[in-house]
Amino acid sequence: METILEQQRRYHEEKERLMDVMAKEMLTKKSTLRDQINSDHRTRAMQDRYMEVSGNLRDLYDDKDGLRKEELNAISGPNEFAEFYNRLKQIKEFHRKHPNEICVPMSVEFEELLKARENPSEEAQNLVEFTDEEGYGRYLDLHDCYLKYINLKASEKLDYITYLSIFDQLFDIPKERKNAEYKRYLEMLLEYLQDYTDRVKPLQDQNELFGKIQAEFEKKWENGTFPGWPKETSSALTHAGAHLDLSAFSSWEELASLGLDRLKSALLALGLKCGGTLEERAQRLFSTKGKSLESLDTSLFAKNPKSKGTKRDTERNKDIAFLEAQIYEYVEILGEQRHLTHENVQRKQARTGEEREEEEEEQISESESEDEENEIIYNPKNLPLGWDGKPIPYWLYKLHGLNINYNCEICGNYTYRGPKAFQRHFAEWRHAHGMRCLGIPNTAHFANVTQIEDAVSLWAKLKLQKASERWQPDTEEEYEDSSGNVVNKKTYEDLKRQGLL
């Protein structure tokens, strides 16, 4: 049986070897997306083992059962030599009873691990399960979520490629449509995005990500700035109307002289019923003189049917909004996969059935050749990779202007490669969301505007221009005096006050 100190030594050795293997794994160059994903999963498995070993080691150092202390006292006491020979005797006795016991050093286990990485088996090359549509982590497969979305009540009917462009624009969906069925759709979409992220980016700490999303969401929810969920104002019955000082009135008849509208406004300010005749309103309002709202008869107050279940509805809305917040974050993380999915679906729709079959056969043969050759792709100019995972031709790279980078401050300093992607992004969700956060409509006036300061100044200029073009009755409305002279409204009013007409 291993001693406590030997267990601690073995755990320390395993931690160091795990750190060494993880460092080598991360430094190894990955030639394909499949290699990158498999490498990340191997690294995560070693990280999990590292955390498990660290936990075991901490428990041994805590020594809650006192065994470590007893062992230290035994080997450091006055009879240390007797303890040494006693343990040596136990070891010899063990090997006498088990003469064929094989002990594999830890170094051999880790060497086998490195060999398995350099020469992976067929099973090791497919560490994660992906659908055919997902292309081993290259594309998203949102067909089930799409079917769920188009079957929602009152949802607009759209095709799959349009859904890929707008499925994260949840802030555009009216609050009235965000019911229990909509919540189930969000849960389904979020579950897929979380599972896909776990498969494609296994090193992403989703617990830490959840805490970050929750903290940001709580802050925005309290401030009423979360997209699609503006802060609800309180009931009109508690804030509408104007209070009236009743100390200046000695009877309800005096109140009646104020008229129906003024009495209604005062009753609304107190949350009381505001209907009835002039006398009834005056009597109802006068009955509150010198009394607190708590002491008034409950029959005097207006019934607000919306107040029932308000707290429950608020909690339900908050749960739905939190699901949306998580979806926004995961879509941001999977932005590259989403863009590639959109292009892949477009390309498939533009091809005939025969061309699609040929493409699938080519992909199968290429994947087989990649597995056989496993060569590192030569890419000295750092060109973008095509749909086949290989660098695109340099002439095509220059033709599309992909060597030119465009930054957009409104999109959070996001970088777009090439003029085509840059021009297209003005109509996409990221730029539209940035403009919405600035409180500016994303119209044609703001095409090619990427700086926040430029957009704000242009919006102020447009508002001034619209204000100057607005019709002004004082100077533009015309009147005719008794002599037949045509003058504007302001001049006419001045002449009328002076009695010159």
UniProtKB/Swiss-Prot annotation:
Annotated Gene Ontology cellular components are: catalytic step 2 spliceosome; nuclear speck; nucleoplasm; nucleus; spliceosomal complex; U2 snRNP; U2-type precatalytic spliceosome; U2-type spliceosomal complex
InterPro entries, from UniProt? Matrin/U1-C_Znf_C2H2 (IPR000690), RNA_Proc_DNA_Dmg_Regulator (IPR051421), SDE2/SF3A3_SAP (IPR025086), SF3A3_dom (IPR031774), SF3a60/Prp9_C (IPR024598), SF3a60_bindingd (IPR021966)
What UniProt keywords are attached to this protein's entry?
Acetylation, Metal-binding, mRNA processing, mRNA splicing, Nucleus, Phosphoprotein, Spliceosome, Zinc, Zinc-finger
- One of the Pfam families matching this protein, by short name: SF3a60_bindingd
> In the record, which positions carry Phosphoserine?
54, 121, 295, 299, 365, 367, 369
Q: Give the intrachain disulfide bonds.
A: none
Superkingdom to which the source organism belongs: Eukaryota
Location(s), subcellular: Nucleus speckle; Nucleus
Give the Gene Ontology MF terms in alphabetical order: RNA binding; zinc ion binding
For the modification Phosphothreonine, the affected residues are 475
Q: Which residues carry this modification: N-acetylmethionine?
A: 1
- List the Matrin-type zinc finger ranges: 406-437
For the biological process aspect of GO, one term held by this record is: mRNA 3'-splice site recognition
Comp. bias (Basic and acidic residues): 343-354
Q: Where is this region: Disordered?
A: 343-374
Q: Major location, coarse class?
A: nucleus
What is the residue range of the motif Nuclear localization signal?
Answer: 175-179
- Family affiliation: Belongs to the SF3A3 family.
Annotated protein name in UniProt: Splicing factor 3A subunit 3
- What's the source species for this entry? Homo sapiens (Human)
- Taxonomic classification: Eukaryota, Metazoa, Chordata, Craniata, Vertebrata
